[in-house]
């Protein structure tokens, strides 16, 4: 509810943002296994597109760059644990969608804190609904098909 006041039409998404009680229920659902998997549709609409009036602004927000740090922050806050993160982002997704298990790995620094800033976003839209928040737990490297990529 507070996010609508802060973000305006940038917060327009489907399904819409919910109450704090709904958010708490989602965390509980991850913890107790009710929620099988989680993802982001990553709708990187530009600020020009999102500046349109409600109903004309496209729905959706960018999320791929902050999904893992948001989940790792929830781990640091004891809302969920690391096993929950692996289960909802990898293990269950592979099983549900019959994806091949691969040897790709994401290395994370669970203690790294970083302020989310619009100017640091790599996607075309150049903004994040989480700008201004400090998140704890960030990827440092990805190993994909035997190639190592350093995260910035």
Range-by-range predicted roles:
Residues 1-5, 49-52, 118-120:
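Short acidic, glycine/serine/threonine-rich loops at helix termini
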